[in-house]
């Protein structure tokens, strides 16, 4: 099956959380495009809506929202995601991925679109060890 590293950012607090998605949680991303929302319950966050904002594959090739394909393409670019020109007017052919999430992606970037009942900090709080029983 496919595994993704999901970087989930919470705009309310400004914090980002790393999630390892596998199985059904990762399957909910397959076929979605950058900008679409998924249900947070797939990752264990009840009541949350998560918006996909970007992704990259194992080589670090970024996904570009304007490229509506599922594979990789070498595109002539003048700026934006995947290319930062060194001088004004510079254009260069760069390798980018399409906006559709496939099994080839490794990392998916997302933000919280709708908050649930619990905060993300509560989901990611470290479990407190139980106090030893008093004798």
From Swiss-Prot:
The organism's superkingdom is given as Archaea
- Listed disulfide bonds for this chain? none
Q: What positions belong to coiled-coil segments? A: none
Q: Which InterPro entries match?
A: Ribosomal_eS6, Ribosomal_eS6_arc
Assigned GO CC terms: ribonucleoprotein complex; ribosome
Q: Where does the sequence pass through the membrane?
A: none
Pfam families recorded: Ribosomal_S6e
Keyword tags: Ribonucleoprotein, Ribosomal protein
DNA damage listed as a keyword = no
* Any single biological process term in GO: translation
Gene Ontology MF annotations: structural constituent of ribosome
Keyword Protease (UniProt): no
Please give the family membership noted in the entry.
Answer: Belongs to the eukaryotic ribosomal protein eS6 family.
Listed NCBIfam families: PRK04290.1-3
In Swiss-Prot or TrEMBL terms, this protein is called Small ribosomal subunit protein eS6
Q: Which organism is it from?
A: Methanospirillum hungatei JF-1 (strain ATCC 27890 / DSM 864 / NBRC 100397 / JF-1)
């Amino acid at each position: 099956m496919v595994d993704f590293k999901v970087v989930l950012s919470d705009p309310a607090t400004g914090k980002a959380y790393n999630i390892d998605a596998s199985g059904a949680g990762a399957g909910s991303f397959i076929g979605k495009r950058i900008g679409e929302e998924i249900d947070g319950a797939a990752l264990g966050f009840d009541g949350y809506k998560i918006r996909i904002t970007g992704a990259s594959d194992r080589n670090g090739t970024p996904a570009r929202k304007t490229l509506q394909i599922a594979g990789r393409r070498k595109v002539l670019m003048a700026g934006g995601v995947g290319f930062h020109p060194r001088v004004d007017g510079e254009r260069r052919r760069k390798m980018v991925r399409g906006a559709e999430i496939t099994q080839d992606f490794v990392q998916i970037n997302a933000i919280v679109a709708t908050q649930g009942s619990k905060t993300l900090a509560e989901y990611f709080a470290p479990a407190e060890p139980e106090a030893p029983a008093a004798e």
